[in-house]
C-alpha cells in the first residue's frame, strides 16, 4: 500500500534505491490542505544548493516518465522476482526470510521487495554474513544481529537474483560441509547485544553544537570518556542516528552502546578513530558545566 494512498500528508521516497534515478536523488510528495507549501519551499531554499545539479533533476524526471509509461509492468516483475527469491532462499539449509505471516499481527502490510535474510541457524552474525556475501560481489542494504537486508528493484533481473541465491547456497554448503557452525551462544550473544543497545536515554546537552565544534579538544581512551563532553559525533548504521553528538555528555549507556556495537563488528560513522579505542572530547573544564 502506497503511503500517499494511505492518506499521508508528506512522503519522502528514495527513488535512487528502487526506481532508477541517480544516487542522492529522491522525491518529496505531498497532498491535502495540511501542507504549508510556502514553508516547505522556504526550508528547501535554505538547505539546497543555489546551483542545482540538472543531471540529477533529469534523472528524476526520467524515472518519473518510466514509472508513468512502464511502471505497472516493472513493479509487477520486481514483485515476482522478490517472491521467487524468497521461495528459493527458504529452501536453503540454515536460511529463512521474514514473511508477512511472521509479523501480520503487528503491521498493516509489508514490502516484499525488501528481503530480510536470517542466517542464525548457520551460526552467523549479520556482520559475518555480510562479509561472506561480499566475497561473491554482493552488497547488502544493512545488517543487524544475525540477518541482512537486500532490496530487489526494477533494475534487478532473474540473473542477478539467481546470483544471490547461488551465493547464499554456497555459504550454507561451505559452513555445513565443514561443520563450522558457530556455537549458538555466539549468535545469542549477538542478539542480546543488539537488543541491549537498541534504546538510549535522552542525551544531556552540555554545550551547544556550535560552541562544541569550535572548542579545543583532546583525544582520550574511550574507557576514560565517561561524563566527558563529546568533541565529535558518533553514529552507527543502522540506525544512522548518532549515539552521541558533539556537545553531549558521554554517559555510561553511550559507552556500553559503543562497546556492544564494536563487539558485533560495526564500524562507526563520524569517528576520527574508526576503531573507537579513543574519542575526541572537550577539556575537563567543560564537564562541570550544568
Regions found by a protein language model. Give the residues of each.
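PLP-dependent enzyme catalytic core of the Aspartate aminotransferase-like
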Residues: 132-135, 141-285
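Conserved small-domain helix->loop->beta segment predominantly found in fold-type I
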Residues: 73-149, 154, 176-203
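Conserved PLP-enzyme active-site core in the AAT-like
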Residues: 1-94, 98-99, 119
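Short acidic (Asp/Glu) and glycine-rich catalytic loops that position anionic groups and cofactors
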Residues: 37-41, 59-68, 108-113, 142-148, ...
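Short, glycine-/Ser/Thr-/acidic-enriched flexible segments
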Residues: 17-18, 33-35, 62, 120-122, ...
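Conserved active-site and cofactor/substrate-binding residues in soluble primary-metabolism enzymes
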Residues: 6, 21, 35-38, 51, ...
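Conserved small/polar residues in nucleotide/adenosyl-binding loops
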Residues: 287-290
Amino acid at each position: 500500500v502506497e503511503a500517499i494512498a494511505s492518506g499521508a500528508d508528506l512522503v519522502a521516497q528514495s527513488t535512487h534505491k528502487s526506481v532508477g534515478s541517480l544516487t542522492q536523488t529522491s522525491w518529496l510528495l505531498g497532498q491535502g490542505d495540511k501542507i504549508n507549501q510556502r514553508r516547505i519551499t522556504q526550508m528547501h531554499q535554505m538547505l539546497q544548493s543555489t546551483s542545482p545539479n540538472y543531471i540529477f533533476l533529469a534523472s528524476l524526471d526520467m524515472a518519473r516518465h518510466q514509472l508513468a509509461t512502464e511502471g505497472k509492468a516493472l513493479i509487477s516483475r520486481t514483485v515476482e522476482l522478490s517472491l521467487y527469491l524468497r521461495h528459493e532462499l527458504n529452501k536453503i539449509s540454515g536460511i529463512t526470510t521474514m514473511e508477512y505471516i511472521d509479523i501480520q499481527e503487528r503491521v498493516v502490510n509489508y514490502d516484499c521487495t525488501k528481503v530480510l535474510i536470517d542466517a542464525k541457524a548457520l551460526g552467523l552474525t549479520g556482520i559475518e554474513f555480510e562479509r561472506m556475501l561480499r566475497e561473491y560481489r554482493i552488497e547488502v542494504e544493512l545488517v543487524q544481529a544475525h540477518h541482512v537486508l537486500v532490496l530487489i528493484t526494477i533494475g534487478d533481473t532473474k540473473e542477478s537474483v539467481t546470483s544471490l541465491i547461488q551465493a547464499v547456497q554456497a555459504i550454507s554448503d561451505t559452513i555445513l560441509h565443514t561443520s563450522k557452525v558457530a556455537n549458538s551462544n555466539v549468535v545469542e550473544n549477538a542478539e542480546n547485544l543488539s537488543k541491549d543497545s537498541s534504546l538510549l536515554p535522552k542525551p544531556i546537552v552540555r554545550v551547544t553544537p556550535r560552541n562544541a565544534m569550535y572548542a579545543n579538544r583532546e583525544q582520550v581512551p574511550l574507557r576514560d570518556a565517561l561524563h566527558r563532553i563529546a568533541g565529535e559525533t558518533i553514529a552507527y548504521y543502522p540506525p544512522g542516528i548518532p549515539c552521541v553528538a558533539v556537545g553531549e555528555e558521554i554517559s555510561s549507556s553511550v559507552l556500553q552502546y559503543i562497546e556492544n556495537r564494536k563487539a558485533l563488528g560495526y564500524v562507526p560513522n563520524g569517528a576520527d578513530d574508526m576503531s573507537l579505542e579513543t574519542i575526541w572530547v572537550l577539556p575537563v573544564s567543560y564537564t562541570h558545566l550544568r
